[in-house]
Amino acid sequence: MLTETDERHLRRAIALAGTARAAGDGPFGSLLVAADGRVLAEEVNTERTDDDITAHPELKLARWAARRLAADEAGRATMYTSCQPCGMCATAIERSGLGRVVYALSTEQLAGLRPADAAPPVAYAGPALFDEARAAVEPS
């Protein structure tokens, strides 16, 4: 269940998405909010502007948090975002230690609204060469 505060911040994320869209970028916006309600940072999608397919607002905020927030502060922070984070962004969010994400549109809802933006399927093969791979990653 979302609080009124959650809804207010989520509306800001949606407004940021509109800003990105108006600039010709993907319609995605996000903000990071501290446990005390302070807005720590805001970002918009800049994939076209920066000619960078990884210029997602969620990824930029996860990087920001990893560099600037103590682990306990990150764990109490909330990211508000206009759409459910993609796999790349979700991994960065988890690795940054952020404790909570609130999003407006789900991945499925977004795909229904913007089918042309769906990523093409990729063929993955693996796991393979377990012993060799294990030797590369196992602690000495």
Q: Where are the regions a protein language model picked out?
A:
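Zinc-dependent deaminase
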Residues: 1-20, 85, 91-140
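Short, basic and Ser/Thr-rich N-terminal targeting/leader segments
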Residues: 24-28, 75
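Short beta-strand scaffold segments in enzyme catalytic cores
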Residues: 28-37
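Residue-level structural signal for beta-strand termini and adjacent loop
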Residues: 44-45
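A short, polar/charged loop-to-alpha-helix boundary motif
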Residues: 49-59, 64
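Immediate flanking context of iron-sulfur cluster ligation sites
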Residues: 71-83
